[in-house]
Amino acid sequence: MKDELFLRGENVPMTKEAVRALALSKLELHRASHLIDVGAGTGSVSIEAALQFPSLQVTAIERNPAALRLLDENRQRFACGNIDILPGEAPMTITGKADAVFMGGSGGHLTALIDWAMGHLHPGGRLVMTFILQENLHSALAHLAHIGACRMDCVQLQLSSLTPLGAGHYFKPNNPVFVIACQKEENHVRDI
């Protein structure tokens, strides 16, 4: 989905189109029934997932009041009745397990969020995270290795977009984004 389709607001983050496409692919939602989107922002990941997989139940968690309004407006705009919005900050209590968790940031609670996410995943469930800070990348990789996450991979995505400049065009660079994907092992016994 094009980024322009989503209602946006100042200081409300949105996972951009190319990053969103890669993250959704890494979540492997074709076999999922429940996705948790932590820090949903405008709802771009939740909405695209809900539209691609109409039988998927999506739980979108967001703490920012302005983002919550945009998230709800975007949910209505795309008629996504399969998205539940939970105001608040993860880690939080959620009933039931998920097949996939997406984290678009950590709010300074990275390892606690990883533990929380793994505790809310079914065995074999997927966790996908995106970061722009190298410190978060290194902390996440180290913690995932420590807790025994499997099928772990990481991609650095750096895109440039064709942009007009005077009478010509140039490729305007965007900041690199790190995308980490992993799986809760099938026989995982360390639930949080």
Curated annotation (Swiss-Prot):
Its EC number is 2.1.1.196. S-adenosyl-L-methionine binds at residues 15, 39-43, 62, 90. It holds the Pfam family MTS. One of its GO terms (molecular function) is protein methyltransferase activity. It catalyses: Co-precorrin-6B + S-adenosyl-L-methionine = Co-precorrin-7 + S-adenosyl-L-homocysteine + CO2. Pathway: Cofactor biosynthesis; adenosylcobalamin biosynthesis; cob(II)yrinate a,c-diamide from sirohydrochlorin (anaerobic route): step 8/10. The keyword Transferase applies. InterPro entries: Cbl_synth_MTase_CbiT (IPR014008), Cobalamin_biosynth_MTase (IPR050714), SAM-dependent_MTases_sf (IPR029063), Small_mtfrase_dom (IPR007848). GO terms for biological process: cobalamin biosynthetic process; methylation. It comes from the Bacteria. SUPFAM superfamilies: S-adenosyl-L-methionine-dependent methyltransferases. Keywords: Cobalamin biosynthesis, Methyltransferase, S-adenosyl-L-methionine, Transferase. Belongs to the methyltransferase superfamily. Bacterial-type CbiT family. This is Cobalt-precorrin-6B C(15)-methyltransferase (decarboxylating). It comes from Salmonella typhimurium (strain LT2 / SGSC1412 / ATCC 700720).
